[in-house]
């Protein structure tokens, strides 16, 4: 049975998740995390895209990503193929690196963008036991860029969009994006 074709909207962000096969680790050390960013940089040179939140865990990654020029599937094929080749070559790994095709969910509104980005940034403190006590202490997440108001050398990372979303919906949320992320959800 053929796979269902994914919907692509060049104007919307998508929450993308990719997990290691059998939930195995696909990022084993700092060099692997760095290699993933080199892959993103390579993909950006081919196809322009924007990431407003990310979290790279040891066995999966989350991206809040928009691909305005090409269908998301084409972009993700480049990213996942390049990283898979890197990993297989480095570790002499055979077989499928990833569990299945990437998960992607269209994020239709600004409120949804805030909610999804919060979920992404809370990943390191939501594990049992938590990987870190504070979100800003996890080095492989975009949260520290928001917390410390720092810039990045990666042109595909954009931290202004979520701040603008929060400003436009500020009657519902705390005054800063980081406060919004740090508030314990009552669900």
Give residue ranges: language-model regions.
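Short beta-strand->loop micro-motif that forms the acidic, two-metal-ion catalytic signature
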Residues: 59-67
């Amino acid at each position: 049975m053929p796979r269902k074709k994914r919907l692509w909207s060049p104007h919307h962000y998508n929450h993308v998740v990719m997990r290691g096969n059998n939930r195995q680790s696909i990022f084993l050390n700092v060099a692997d995390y760095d290699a993933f960013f080199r892959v993103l940089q390579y993909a950006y040179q081919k196809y322009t895209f924007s990431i407003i939140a990310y979290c790279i865990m040891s066995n999966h990654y989350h991206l809040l990503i928009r691909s305005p020029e090409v269908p998301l599937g084409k972009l993700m094929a480049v990213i996942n193929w390049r990283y898979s080749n890197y990993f297989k070559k480095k570790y002499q790994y055979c077989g499928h690196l990833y569990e299945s095709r990437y998960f992607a969910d269209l994020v239709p509104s600004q409120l949804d963008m805030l909610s999804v980005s919060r979920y992404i940034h809370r990943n390191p403190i939501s594990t049992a036991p938590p990987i870190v006590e504070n979100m800003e202490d996890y080095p492989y997440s975009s949260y520290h860029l928001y917390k410390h108001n720092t810039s990045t050398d990666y042109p595909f990372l954009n931290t202004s969009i979520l701040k603008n979303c929060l400003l436009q919906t500020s009657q519902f949320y705390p005054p800063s994006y980081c406060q919004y992320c740090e508030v314990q959800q009552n669900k």
